[in-house]
Every structure is written in structure tokens, then in C-alpha cells.
Amino acid sequence: MNSKHSYVELKDKVIVPGWPTLMLEIDFVGGTSRNQFLNIPFLSVKEPLQLPREKKLTDYFTIDVEPAGHSLVNIYFQIDDFLLLTLNSLSVYKDPIRKYMFLRLNKEQSKHAINAAFNVFSYRLRNIGVGPLGPDIRSSGP
């Protein structure tokens, strides 16, 4: 991706066992597939993300799904300053979010994006709570 900006990879270390998770859900449409979707753990948070009612996630968060080789795909995203500050304040891991970032998809995830010809229909960040052992896992620490 030829860019004016430097994109930083969002690493797995932002996912901390025992804490609530923001899940990035992407729905694809088109290509050789029908209704392909991906659920990707995005960020461990101390409390749920709540955006102002009058705004949509797309007002703060833009994604672009691009090939990163013959069989691999990256998801690039640009984050508005308001959402950037909000995510970093909620994050369990200290200040992991930057304005320009990307995620590397594994081969199986990449296959879904390729089958849909990279055509994103919709995306969302969903709050996912912890399981029954979450507090115990959290107290034992990684």
C-alpha cells in the first residue's frame, strides 16, 4: 500500500486474558462468496466502548482490506482522534492504539477476504464480556 502515512501493526499483546474484548466484526459481500464474515479480537478493555448515539462507527473508524501477497491479507485502519483517545483510555494494555494501524490476517481469515474480492459490506466493534473464569484468569495474570 503506497501511503503518505506510516501504518503500525496492531499486535496480539493487546489481547489480555480475563478482560472484556472489543471484537472487530467484518461482513464481506461479493466475489465468489456469499455473506463471508470475520470476527477478530481487536483490543482488551477495562469497560465497554460506548459511542455517542448521533454518530456511527464509520464516522470515527475507516477500514480498508488489501492483499499483502498472493494468499495473505492485511486490514488497514484509520482512527479518528476522538476514538483514538477513547480506545487508549479503555485499553488494558497501555496506549496501544495509533491513528494509522493494520492487522495481519492468517491464511484462513485471508481466504474469506480474498473470496469476497476484498469487498467490505459493513463492520463494527462489538463489546464481548468475560467468561465465568475471567476474574480468576485476570488475577493470576499472564
Swiss-Prot record:
What does the UniProt keyword field contain?
Host cell membrane, Host cytoplasm, Host membrane, Membrane, Viral matrix protein, Virion
- Report the GO terms under cellular component: host cell cytoplasm; host cell plasma membrane; membrane; virion component
What positions does the entry give for GMP binding?
D64, V65, E66, A117
What subcellular compartments does it reside in? Virion; Host cytoplasm; Host cell membrane
An MF annotation (GO) of this entry:
structural constituent of virion
InterPro entries assigned: BDV_M, BDV_M_sf
Q: How does it sit in the membrane?
A: Peripheral membrane protein
In what way is this protein post-translationally modified?
Not glycosylated.
* Role: Plays a crucial role in virion assembly and budding.
Name-wise, this protein is Matrix protein
The organism is Borna disease virus 1 (BoDV-1)
